């Protein structure tokens, strides 16, 4: 499942990334979801969402006309005053429908408060047993748990960075990286230590944390 949120989005990157995802999941059609102003991405690219969710208060006039023209799209109109964002509402909806792997585009560029809120959706997904990731043309952001293997030939970009997802991370070990760690207690205050690392081994690099702790992988 791919949710397109209302933040800034590089359309050429997004279209290429969607093609890549569909190729990797050739036996199953991607479910495409427009979260509020993310609807404009579909209007501008000619793609048709399977689901449109939001109060649509920030959608352009052209986007609202496009919304009215959709005949094969399930539309969930929300009240402007609510207890979550349109992106979180869309995420909860597709999880309730059975989605187990969700990518969110348009979630990193624009308002910083929305970006920080979208980072929290990674933890929300983990709590519900669902993998959630955010992506743009420069970043792929997900949670990393103990024992995660990162393959050099599959990595998104040149660099790999780690940040605590919540409180301090105890016992962080990085093997096979340019800058290794052994049993390090990583806090937000010193997370600059784990910025712009590089996978050194050709095959695989390892992360190890104590049980039930996670870090953000960018």
Task: Report each predicted region and the residues it spans.
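N-terminal beta-strand-loop-alpha-helix module at the start
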Residues: 1-66
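Class I SAM-dependent methyltransferase SAM-binding "motif I" and its flanking Rossmann-like core
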Residues: 123-155
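A charged, well-structured terminal subsegment
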Residues: 160-180
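A conserved acidic, glycine/proline-rich C-terminal tail/linker
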Residues: 176-201
């Amino acid at each position: 499942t791919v949710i397109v949120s209302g933040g800034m989005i590089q359309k050429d990157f997004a279209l290429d990334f969607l093609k890549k995802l569909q190729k990797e999941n050739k036996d199953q059609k991607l479910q495409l979801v427009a979260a509020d102003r993310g609807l404009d991405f579909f209007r501008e690219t000619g793609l048709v969402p399977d689901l449109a969710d939001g109060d649509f208060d920030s959608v352009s006039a052209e986007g609202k006309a496009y919304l009215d023209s959709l005949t094969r799209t399930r539309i969930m109109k929300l009240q402007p005053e609510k207890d979550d964002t349109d992106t979180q509402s869309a995420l909860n909806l597709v999880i309730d429908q059975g989605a187990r792997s969700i990518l969110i585009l348009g979630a990193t560029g624009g308002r910083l408060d929305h970006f920080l809120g979208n980072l929290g959706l990674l933890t929300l997904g983990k709590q519900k047993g669902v993998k959630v990731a955010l992506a743009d043309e420069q970043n792929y952001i997900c949670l990393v748990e103990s024992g995660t293997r990162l393959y050099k030939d599959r990595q998104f970009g040149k660099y790999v960075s780690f940040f605590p997802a919540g409180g301090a991370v105890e016992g962080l070990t990085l093997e096979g990286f340019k800058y290794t760690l052994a049993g390090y207690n990583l806090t937000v205050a010193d997370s600059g230590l784990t910025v712009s690392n590089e996978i050194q081994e050709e095959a695989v690099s390892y992360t190890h944390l104590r049980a039930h702790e996670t870090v953000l992988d960018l």
